[in-house]
Curated annotation (Swiss-Prot):
Stretches for region Disordered: 1-46
Organism ancestry: Bacteria, Bacillati, Actinomycetota, Actinomycetes, Mycobacteriales
Protein name: Large ribosomal subunit protein uL15
Any GO MF annotation of the entry: structural constituent of ribosome
Pfam families registered for this protein in UniProt: Ribosomal_L27A (PF00828)
Entry similarity comment: Belongs to the universal ribosomal protein uL15 family.
Keywords: Ribonucleoprotein, Ribosomal protein, RNA-binding, rRNA-binding
One Gene Ontology biological process: translation
NCBIfam families named in the record: rplO_bact (TIGR01071)
Function: Binds to the 23S rRNA.
Known partners and oligomeric status: Part of the 50S ribosomal subunit.
Basic and acidic residues composition bias: residue spans: 15-28
Length: 146
């Protein structure tokens, strides 16, 4: 007779049922394998418990200060970027900057003063730094805030 898959059985003693402890004196009752007294005999200890030593989360310093929930964030464009994106000069609005891929739409835009500007541009955005206004004016352009 050939042996088939359904003839196979686990070896005797290989599979034993789980022992249910604490269910009567005759079968691992009373202390249920925990020994007598002590912390481990009673409920359980928290995962972060370090045996009475000052725990790590209390040893580390707290973060100082706070984050202002009303802070306004601007997308920044430098004067040098405007000179590179608009070499012929002319009108520059937030929509033009979005079309050129310099900023994302529906966001506030601020022009910073890094770089040089040689052509006259009429820039209309949400905010300017002082140096950006000076460089735009020096090149013969205008800086208008929305």
């Amino acid at each position: 007779m050939t042996i088939k898959l359904h003839h196979l059985r686990p070896a005797p003693g290989a599979k034993t049922e789980k022992t249910r402890v604490g269910r009567g004196e005759g079968s691992k009752g009373k202390t249920a394998g925990r020994g007598t007294k002590g912390t481990k005999a009673r409920k359980n200890v928290p995962a972060a418990f370090e045996g009475g030593q000052m725990p790590l989360h209390m040893r580390l310093p707290k973060l100082k200060g706070f984050t202002n929930p009303f802070r306004t964030e601007y997308q920044v464009v430098n004067v040098g970027d405007i000179a590179r994106l608009f070499p012929e000069g002319g009108q520059v609005t937030v929509e033009d900057l979005v079309a050129k891929g310099a900023v994302r739409k529906n966001q506030l835009v601020k022009v910073l003063g890094d770089g040089d500007l040689t052509v006259a541009v009429q820039v209309t955005v949400d905010k300017f730094t002082g140096s950006a206004k000076e460089k735009i004016a020096a090149a013969g352009g205008t800086a208008t805030e929305l």
